[in-house]
Amino acid sequence: LMDEKNGLKFTLERDCGLKVGDLAEVVGFPNLSGPSPVLQQCLARAIGRQPLPPSSPLEPGKLISPDHDSTVVHVEGLLVGLSQQKNETILELQAGVHTFAARLESRNPSSPLSVPIGARLQLTGVYHGIGGNRAEGRALDSFELLLRSPTSIVILARPPWWTLERLLIALGSLMTILVLVLIWTSLLSRKVTQRTAQ
């Protein structure tokens, strides 16, 4: 649930058919024990439709903040890991000194997400703070992004072609060629020496 700037998590008592973009009234019991307040055992109803508020940028130095919790944000990062689990794809990204996960529900597990490791990405999703307790003054431990669809992932730059693995293969190939050339010249030198001795 989100207004212009703030977000709030809530758990429904029963499904009420809310969809993304619905304007809703929500009533529930507050729980203040986590990184941000959560309404539990909620009853909700849609009272209209409204465009989603624009995403706000996450700055590299201010990634972990309870102020972002449950809001739509966008962040740039370097893809360092990609794994497919039962019903979701998990992207592991690095932004500055922080590493975080982005989760994308897999609607079609037979066609996995194909994003190359090392690519620079921009992700847009809902910020989900992990750990911490605002009431006790404990800071967030980390966060993850909950992505809506594959369109929430934009590839800003592909990884460089010269990776460490490719560089080592090229150096190994050159060393092998150099050794073969040295062996061939040594054999040729012996033959020339034998012929001149005759």
Describe each PLM feature range.
Residues 159-196:
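Alpha-helical transmembrane signal-anchor helices
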Residues 1-165, 169:
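OB-fold single-stranded nucleic acid-binding module
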Residues 126, 195-198:
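Charged/polar helix/coil "stalk" or linker segments at domain boundaries
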